[in-house]
């Protein structure tokens, strides 16, 4: 995982990795963050050309710490069900409930 910028919000490679690792741990233990539904299936309706094959899971990424519940914000990391990092996406700048890619996605 590399650093990325979602809209104008930069994330370090470490922040991206932390979110992807949390998503993987929750997914593998069939658990979620707090009382939320994250991680959950990401259907890729937008048609992103990820470097790894799906199926995919989405999980919120934070600038401080790792998401553990509450408001997810606009930004997500995407992993596949083998816990391979696929990319980072954001609702910011997208219409409706869709996503656009962050830098490097």
UniProtKB/Swiss-Prot annotation:
The organism sits in which domain of life?
A: Eukaryota
Q: Name one Pfam family in it.
A: Ribonuclease
Q: Does the keyword Chloroplast apply?
A: no
Q: Which reaction does it catalyse?
A: [RNA] containing guanosine + H2O = an [RNA fragment]-3'-guanosine-3'-phosphate + a 5'-hydroxy-ribonucleotide-3'-[RNA fragment]
**Stored InterPro entries:** N1-like (IPR000026), Ribonuclease/ribotoxin (IPR016191), Ribonuclease_N1/T1 (IPR051386)
A GO molecular function term, named singly, is: RNA binding
Q: Which residues cross the membrane?
A: none
Disulfide-bonded cysteine pairs: these are 6-102, 24-83
Give the UniProt family note: Belongs to the ribonuclease N1/T1 family.
Q: What is this protein called?
A: Extracellular guanyl-specific ribonuclease Fl2
